């Protein structure tokens, strides 16, 4: 006889690959869901997993799995961009189905800069190289600019979104830029490369400058095509000339 009492709600499932409640393209391909052990767990229990209220997977509990977490996989065809609600229910003999609380996540599989065309390349041709003043592009960075710093720009890129984190690479030096804001989406990113970064990068006749983008759920753009610059050696600054002190001529 089936009991009619409503069982207590079970704990929500967890998604170990989620980053800030988001699912990226890599995770979506093999998305896993963990279900914690629950009170009264018995051999023969049937766990059914639901993605946006659609049945996605199930697992029958065996004797050796009692008291252990259960891991299920969501088919990739279910994992579409946008918000998703994940829950499960437990079916036990002689009991009504016990439902869990719901976990909410957001799926984002569109990478910053779009999908790179070459699988085996570290470069994304969908990203524009950094923009620099024409004189710097032609003549390089002179000693005065090394001391002062230089401006550059990053053009808007495909799938640009709020929360994107851009990392500039100046030679072997990396510089993290402020995250893209909602107002900044679709706009050119203005960057000032400070003297400290240029000096640390050192003088070079072919220094490479590039950048990459990591979105809020961990999708990576790969590196933009590089811009090659000549960096002049750092000239020492002139020491300040001491002000002469008046010395009165001795009498006699």
Predicted regions and their residues:
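Intrinsically disordered, low-complexity linker/tail regions enriched in polar/charged residues
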Residues: 1-252
């Amino acid at each position: 006889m089936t009991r009619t009492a409503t069982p207590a709600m079970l704990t929500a499932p967890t998604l170990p690959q989620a980053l800030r409640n988001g699912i990226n393209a890599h995770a979506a391909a093999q998305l896993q869901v963990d279900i914690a052990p629950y009170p009264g767990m018995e051999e023969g229990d049937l766990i059914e997993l639901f993605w946006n209220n659609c049945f996605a997977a199930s697992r029958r509990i065996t004797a050796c799995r009692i008291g252990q977490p259960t891991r299920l996989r969501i088919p990739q065809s279910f994992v579409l961009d946008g918000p998703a609600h994940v829950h499960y229910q437990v079916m036990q003999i002689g009991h009504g189905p016990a439902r869990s609380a719901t976990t909410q996540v957001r799926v984002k599989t569109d990478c910053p800069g779009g999908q790179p065309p070459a699988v085996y390349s570290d470069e994304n041709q969908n990203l524009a190289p950094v923009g620099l003043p024409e004189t710097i592009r032609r003549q390089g960075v002179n000693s005065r600019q090394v001391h002062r710093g230089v401006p550059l720009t990053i053009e808007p890129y495909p799938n640009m979104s709020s929360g994107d984190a851009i990392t500039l690479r100046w030679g072997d030096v990396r510089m993290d830029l402020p995250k893209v804001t909602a107002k900044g989406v679709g706009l050119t990113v203005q960057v000032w490369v400070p003297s400290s970064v240029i000096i640390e990068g050192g003088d070079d006749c072919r220094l490479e400058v590039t950048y990459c983008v990591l979105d809020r759920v961990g999708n990576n753009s790969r590196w933009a095509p590089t811009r090659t610059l000549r960096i002049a050696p750092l000239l020492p600054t002139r020491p300040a000339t001491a002000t002469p002190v008046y010395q009165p001529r001795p009498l006699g």
